[in-house]
């Protein structure tokens, strides 16, 4: 999973047809297993790029994208947010979204 280093990099990458971002902090104990589960989950969708953003490193991301808790997983399609899951992540909802995009 590639790590985003700047808000501009995020803006550029979010323009893809579909992309996934996970916002987390370096001290978040919940973020580690959720990130691992997301990576395993996304192995079924290798064509969809996945990125991680550490809020300490990209402060602007938290404010501009209204990230109030971590972990937060956000799906973007051509620069528009289409799904957001925070804290209690519903992987079934994410799978339904990806099935729609696959068809």
Regions found by a protein language model. Name each.
Residues 4, 23, 39-42, 46-60:
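Thiol-based oxidoreductase modules, predominantly thioredoxin-like and allied folds used
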Residues 33-37, 56, 64-65, 91, ...:
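Chalcogenol-based redox active-site neighborhoods
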């Amino acid at each position: 999973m590639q790590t985003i280093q700047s808000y501009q990099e995020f803006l550029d990458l979010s323009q893809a047809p579909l992309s996934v971002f996970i916002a987390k902090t370096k001290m978040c104990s919940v973020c580690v297993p959720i990130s691992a589960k997301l990576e395993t989950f996304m192995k079924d969708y290798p064509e969809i790029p996945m990125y991680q953003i550490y809020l300490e490193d990209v402060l602007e991301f938290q404010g501009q994208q209204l990230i109030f808790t971590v972990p937060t997983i956000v799906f973007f399609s051509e620069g528009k947010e289409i799904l957001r899951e925070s804290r209690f992540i519903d992987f079934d909802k994410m799978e339904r979204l990806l099935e729609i995009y696959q068809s």
